[in-house]
Swiss-Prot record:
One of its GO terms (biological process) is protein ubiquitination. This is Elongin-B. Keywords: Acetylation, Nucleus, Phosphoprotein, Transcription, Transcription regulation, Ubl conjugation pathway. Pathway: Protein modification; protein ubiquitination. The gene is Elob. GO terms for cellular component: Cul2-RING ubiquitin ligase complex; Cul5-RING ubiquitin ligase complex; cytosol; elongin complex; VCB complex. It comes from Mus musculus. Residues 108-118 have a biased composition (Polar residues).
């Protein structure tokens, strides 16, 4: 089954999908194709816990029930900087601006679906 993932590092977010049977190392290969950093310079995390390269995504807890298209699971990403890995850091998403008045629902006293019957 497919799992849907949101790989996050600082302000970078990658949306991807993979098979539950894919390994963590294979997921690092996907990241390498996008961010041009080899797997040995990457660490992937689930809830601040380092993921083992040899385990499958399913063994790490990513299943089609927990990582759905409409609610992808979050995977943290850290890169090697010189001889050590950076600390895992994920910036929170920004808040959307307030809706303009013209887009806010209008309370006209009746349902928008009601029509006058003649």
């Amino acid at each position: 089954m497919d799992v849907f993932l949101m790989i996050r590092r600082h302000k970078t977010t990658i949306f991807t999908d993979a098979k539950e049977s894919s390994t963590v190392f294979e997921l690092k290969r996907i990241v390498e194709g996008i961010l041009k950093r080899p797997p040995e310079e990457q660490r992937l995390y689930k809830d601040d816990q380092l993921l083992d390269d040899g385990k499958t995504l399913g063994e790490c807890g990513f299943t089609s029930q927990t990582a759905r298209p409409q609610a992808p699971a979050t995977v943290g990403l850290a890169f090697r900087a010189d001889d050590t890995f950076e600390a895992l850091r994920i910036e929170p998403f920004s808040s959307p601006p307030e809706l303009p008045d013209v887009m806010k629902p209008q309370d006209s006293g009746g349902s928008a679906n009601e029509q006058a019957v003649q």
